[in-house]
Amino acid sequence: MSRIGFAPVSVPSGVTVTINGQNVEVKGPKGTLNTDIPAPIAVAQEGDEIVVSRPDDHRKNRSLHGLSRSLVNNMVVGVTEGYTTKMEIFGVGYRVQLKGKDLEFSLGYSHPILIKADEGITFAVDGNTKFSISGIDKQKVGQIAANIRGLRKDDPYKGKGIRYEGEQVRRKVGKTGK
């Protein structure tokens, strides 16, 4: 049984947390995030810690308890440190470049693909094949990274495509010729 929900979230100095009913707002040096916590879960601030509690041990409340604690923790880490996802491109002729604040991909299609930077998201390009996505919202950074990866998923036969840095792709053996 997971005990993630019972661990209090420590609030570092320079971060202010405002709890208004089910709405939690976290302000820090990098920005402001807010989210709504599901109804049966209670959030309270005790000193420099945020405590998340549940009314009973029903299955749904147990799952929402851990989720709510993780959401609050992700917001605190986001406004203090931020989140970065690094990705790389493999394949002949596949490349990425920065166009203003947006990313432009050449992935073997007949047209370049432009990914616009959402509010609070920044892109950085290192060479033609490596880039990173940064922001304070962990969900938004992860979703944009997943959308970009979906533009050209890794091919298990040739190893071409977009992948997360350090991701290992299981290669397959092609058909044997006669």
UniProtKB/Swiss-Prot annotation:
SUPFAM superfamilies, A to Z: Ribosomal protein L6
Entry's Gene Ontology molecular function annotations: rRNA binding; structural constituent of ribosome
GO biological process: one example: cytoplasmic translation
Keyword Magnesium among UniProt keywords: no
Keywords carried by this UniProt record: Ribonucleoprotein, Ribosomal protein, RNA-binding, rRNA-binding
Name recorded for this polypeptide: Large ribosomal subunit protein uL6
GO cellular-component term (any): cytosolic large ribosomal subunit
Oligomeric and partner information: Part of the 50S ribosomal subunit.
Family membership: Belongs to the universal ribosomal protein uL6 family.
Source superkingdom: Bacteria
Gene3D superfamilies listed in its UniProt record: Ribosomal protein L6, alpha-beta domain
A Pfam family reported for this protein in Swiss-Prot or TrEMBL: Ribosomal_L6
